[in-house]
Every structure is written in C-alpha cells, then in structure tokens.
Amino acid sequence: MAIRLEKGQRINLEKNNGSKLTQFCVGCNWGAVIEKKYKEVVISEGFLGFGRKTENKQYDHVIDVDLDLSCLLFDVEGRPIDHIYSPLYRFGDNKVGLPNGKLDTLDRALHHTGDDLTGDQSGDDGLDNEIITVDLVRINPNVNSIVFFLNIYNNDDYQGDFSSIPYAYIRMYEGTPTKVKEVFAQYDVATKTECVGMRGLILGKLYRRNGEWKFNAIGDAFADKSIVHTIARVIKDYSH
C-alpha cells in the first residue's frame, strides 16, 4: 500500500519486501481546469425574424494548466551541482544568472520526460503528466541531496493557484513513465489548504544519511510568480 505523505514526514526508501528502492519515477499528475459557461443558441428562427426563440446552453470551457516539475542537486556543502527543469526556460537569454533548462543530469541518473503544457483534458487517465526518472545506483557520488519542486507556469491561460486545479498529486513509484508497477508514496497537492493562493511548492528532498538514501516530504508552498524565485528559495533554504 502506498504511503500517503504528510508535510514534514520522513521515510526510508524501503519496499515491503525489505529491499531498497533505487530505481523509480517521481511523477506529477494534474487536470486542466473545467469552467461551466453558457452560450445563447437558437432553437427556432420563427417566421421572417419574428418569433425567434433562443436559450442558454451550458458547456465546458477547458483552461490549460501548465505545471512544471523540476529538481536541483546539491553536494554535501549545499552547493548546487546539477539541475533539471524545462528546456523552455532559457535563462541565459534573460540574464538572470541561472543555467538554461535541460532534461537530463550530467551523469544521466535522472531524466525528465518533457514539459506538459495543458494537464489532463478529459479527466484523470491514471498516468503522470510530467515525470523524472531516478536511478540512485548511477548517481554522481558527489550528490548529497536532490530537492524536487513544482511551479505553475506564469502564462495567460491560467492565473489561478494550486487549489483551483481539480486534482494534482505527486508520487514515487516503481515502473516506467508509461506503466505504473507499484506506487511507493504519494502527496496530494490540490487537497492541501496551505496551497490556497500558492503557485510554487517545495515537494521534498532525497538525501543521503550514513550511505543510505531517505526522503523528506517538505510540502512548503509559496506565492512565487516565477520559477526563478523558487530556484533561489531552494538554493538558499533547502540545500542543506
């Protein structure tokens, strides 16, 4: 049975059979926002324009929601040594002092499956929209911690917060990006009251202790309008 993570909870990466979880996916699944709207439709034209009848019919207006799942990797001193976030973030062009986004860590131990710009359009399909695959066996020995975080991309389509999204959850599971074998742990974002009004979320941290990897579900939410602010926050407050 999957662990339902709560804010501040720490867990060992140990499966039910006692073996360690070393190769897994960290995925985020969410739905587009559905608004009920009405439009006037003609039900009878009448005769020569007289007696024309109309009525308001309800329809679903789908609003794309672009969430971005990212992570930063730190050494034992808390210095950032690698990163994964959407290649659509071209910080080098904006001169904000951050590297451009990429989908793989330098050691290829972590891989992002790509940026989903919309969310599920027709309800929960059971698959994650954005996924970072993790292989702790291959990871650079200098990596001491990995902080995962989530942002709502700031565009004209959706200006709301996490609480307005019909469902959004993060999970760690064994399997592949297209097939979930067994869910190890899950954190439900959209159900958290602390996410009301918030657009950035520090999800959790993988970290080494005495040669073993553990996970801390952080769950700190912020009103960050840009991933730039969240990255700066992670480096300053969550790298140790």
Regions found by a protein language model. Name each.
Residues 1-145, 149-240:
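Intrinsic-disorder/low-complexity signal
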